[in-house]
Amino acid sequence: EVSAMNYDKEYFVKLLEKLVLPLKQHYSPKGANLYLGHTGAAYEDRTIPMEGFSRVLWGLVPLWAGGGNIDGFSEIYASGLTAGTDPSSDEYWGGFRKGDQKFVEIAAISYGLLLAPDKLWEPLSDTAKENLSAYLRLSNNYEVSDNNWRMFPVLVNLALKSLNQPYDQHLIDYGLERLDSFYLGNGWYKDGVTEQRDYYIPFALHFYSLIYAKVCANDDPERCALFKERAEEFAKEYIYWFDSKGRALVYGRSLTYRFAQAAFWSACLYADVDVFSYGIVKGIIVRHFEEWFQNPITDNGGVLTIGYRYPNLHMSESYNSPGSPYWSLKAFILLALPDEHPFWQAEAEPLPQLNKNKFLKEAQMIIQHDGDKAVSYT
């Protein structure tokens, strides 16, 4: 049934609109904070609305980069970046500390500066540009966790570099070095010095490395080719985590990020990773979205909830605040593809023929796959 209609660019734009339009009324007066609820998290309350603000960028940025727009949002974000990074503003986000949640959130801002500077940098006044640049550089003075967080300084300093701002090349090199040290083979990384092999591999480590592969293709062609090769290998294993109905394994941390489970496939399209046909990849992504949207994942105001198939605080981590689920918007990186990209015209196709049993050695997992369900044994 999924291939019966044309899932063109407009289909994905409409999905994104459905997710972000209900948020518009919840921004602070200057736009730097997004207030979505009253549950707490393991970090400072003042960072919670900043997280909400930043995470929506995972969806808006590729929309803007691909030539799209949702009325009013680019103005909110230019104003919000100005206020959030101005120490004299009442909406200032505050400085950083070791292990700060804001390190995660400035990665989304950096993504925006890399892909959509016309919306997030060029409209800013000279003073606002100086403040934003200084704010991002301030984060360079702090150590980040030795896991997927190592890629945040990489994105921050790539963004600064792309805007001809002072940046720290050492932090880019060191982050990429650490990423290489996490590599296990067959496309798999570990998320730091740990046994964790969960969705942070596709929606964090691969996701960031594929952004790098796209934006640094001319500056660092060898490494970019390597990142794409690893993603190709990973895709052949990760596909086993999805069943023919679009559902993915309920496994590991941060399950409230829901359809971020498909972000890897979207990032492969963005970075021109050639592994399965456009039709197969479109089928995986579309079935996944359709499956999610059949479930009550938003509240009655259209805001994504903490939970999984339905609102459920038992499915949260200590670091999940009301804005956290918008990490799921990473799945929309495919909107950065130009309108004429062949993906938009491709027909959604079913999964290819997969083995009934598959040993994913680096993931320490055996998958039993019979089409309409995937079961993992770990």
Give short role names for the model-derived ranges.
Residues 378:
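Conserved small/polar residues in nucleotide/adenosyl-binding loops
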Residues 366-370:
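Short acidic-hydrophobic surface loop/beta-edge motif
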Residues 46-52, 58-63, 77-266:
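Aromatic-lined, polymer-binding surfaces characteristic
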Residues 235-262, 268-316, 320, 339-364:
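Non-catalytic carbohydrate-binding regions of carbohydrate-active enzymes
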Residues 272, 333, 372-374:
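Short, glycine-/Ser/Thr-/acidic-enriched flexible segments
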Residues 327, 333-336:
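Long, hydrophobic alpha/beta structural blocks
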Residues 2-51, 75-80:
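Low-complexity, Ser/Thr/Pro/Gly-enriched N-terminal "stalk/linker" regions
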